[in-house]
Amino acid sequence: MSTRVETLEFQAEARQLLQLMVHSIYSNKDIFLRELISNASDALDKLRIASLVKDGPRVDSADLRIEIEADVNARTLTVRDNGIGMSRDEVVGLIGTIAKSGTAELLRKLRESEDGAASSDLIGQFGVGFYSTFMVADKVTLLTGKAGESGGTRWESDGAGTYVIETVDDAPRGTAVTVHLKPEDSEDRLYDYTDENKIREIVKRYSDFIAWPIRLVSAPAAKDRDSNDDGTAESGAGAENAGDRPLNSMKALWARPQSEVDKAEYDQFYQHLSHDWTGPLEVIHMKGEGTFEYEALLFIPSRAPLDLFTRDARRGVQLYVKRVFIMDDCAELLPNYLRFVRGVVDTHDLSLNISREILQQDRRIQLVRRRLVKKILASIRALQENDAERYRTLWKEFGAALKEGLLEDADNQDAILGLVSVDSTHDADRPTTLREYIERMKDAQNEIYYLTGDSRGMIENSPHMEAFRAKGYEVLILTDPVDEVWVERVAEFDGKPLKSIAKGEVDLDTDDEKKSSEAEREQLRKDFAALLPWLAAKLEDDVKEVRLSSRLTTSPACLVGDTFDMTPALEKMYRAMGHEMPRPKRILELNPTHALVMGLRAAHERDADSAALGDTAELLYGMALLAEGGELRDPARFTRLLAERLAEAL
């Protein structure tokens, strides 16, 4: 085989990340070994799965392992696996570049964070853990051979911005990463990573639950290599090391009784599984028995991942069959709105070579999914009832995702509605549930009032709020983008209809108030009988009706929709998604007691044909549109008319 040697540059983002690692100020440098072991474990998982496919590589799972070789004299540490390996192109693609969304966000947060736990969390979340080796290395060498291919690839870099890659004739199947260690420096927390006790400590802390045996081998023994059945060389320990006890326990934590697992073990397993080095907010350990048996160990994180709302974000949990790993991110086991849940599901009755296509149709998987969802929602409900602080944390981090379930999961809609926690005008510092809102409703109130918008400040200052504030009615303040959608889909909660205060007619007066003000109302209808149709004609391109308002107390006008109209914010959202949305005509409501509206009526009575009067009508509509956060059709014209009217008033 011809040897091809190239010196290539890292992608720009990779160079920046390398510089952060090479000149690292992060306190927890031990994580480099955790990341190398995690990568090795992934490679072994992929090889075992590939072996299940027809014409896949022949593999004896009992021989699959991870080795750690420490050479004290050479000051090197090698992490070796006999997994799937990589081709030359894969090495360039996976190590020479960072082909991931959110890279800029990762770099920014790493620069901001000097805390070891925080930085290791970010490194793990973004899947760029290989680069962490440069926190402890002067140079890193990688040798890899792809399963089923002859030859291999050697990669080497000192982290200065370039790397050397070459094709080699002889490479065992799998990957070996050799870290040429920097000198010890206790002040910089650079420890002796060739020390056996230090290696054992790191493996026990971070990688105890790795499913493959991790063995520590001496440098001379590691040079003795076995051979595969097919004759290709395979990395492995020498005979004198074959019986060594693994450094990790490899315990299937989910298979043990819940009473026998302590919090520290749950935390360690969660950290291994998720690369989130804070503890989980909630642990859900369950077992299903009967016609279809399974165990599940699920975790609700303490904080949302950075990519929770990105299209290519991780979702789903790990699937095992009889303790054998099948796949990561099994989306078929949990709905999308629970994508933040991490964990493991181990079934007893599925085939080891089950495919995603079969999973989608398998009734047993659908049964497990239903049970998992109900258990997760019940656990969140228990937090809501018994631990308000942790529940508020959960809702702050994942509430927006959970509310997506109101659109996706009709079977559990009522359960999710019971969990919904939103801001309201009742208490600016404490969100409320719908159940709590109902308990505070006024005696004559039959509807749950809400208003959607971009922010709490915008909603609180909306003209639509004026009458509700004046009469002491509580209004839900909904600011998540998903709120615009689910309130349209959900008709009621606990028999109480949900009512947007920006739609339809609003009448908050009691029967006695209506009787006492009936004469006044009738007089106002007569006074404005000429102005209202005139305004409707002037603004016919934008409004379908002009009427007197019962919801305004201080603003001159506002725009409202009919009961089943789409909100302006929802229209804007659909347009941003590329949908063609016509601009529906709205209803313009006037405050008959406002000085501007009263002046407009008087001016109309004096000269209904005045051009200036028509301009004022246009300005009035524009003001109402801006007050609800809408967009003017012609901002330049609006500004010019406003300037002219202001000049006339001076």
Swiss-Prot record:
Write down the SUPFAM superfamilies for this protein, in alphabetical order.
ATPase domain of HSP90 chaperone/DNA topoisomerase II/histidine kinase, HSP90 C-terminal domain, Ribosomal protein S5 domain 2-like
Question: Which terms in the Gene Ontology molecular function aspect does this entry carry?
Answer: ATP binding; ATP hydrolysis activity; ATP-dependent protein folding chaperone; unfolded protein binding
The main location class comes to: cytoplasm
The region called A is annotated at 1-356
The compartments listed are: Cytoplasm
Q: Name one Pfam family in it.
A: HATPase_c_3
Share what the entry says about its subunit structure, partners included: Homodimer.
User: What does the function comment of this entry state?
Assistant: Molecular chaperone. Has ATPase activity.
Name assigned to this protein: Chaperone protein HtpG
Organism of provenance: Frankia casuarinae (strain DSM 45818 / CECT 9043 / HFP020203 / CcI3)
Lineage of the organism: Bacteria, Bacillati, Actinomycetota, Actinomycetes, Frankiales
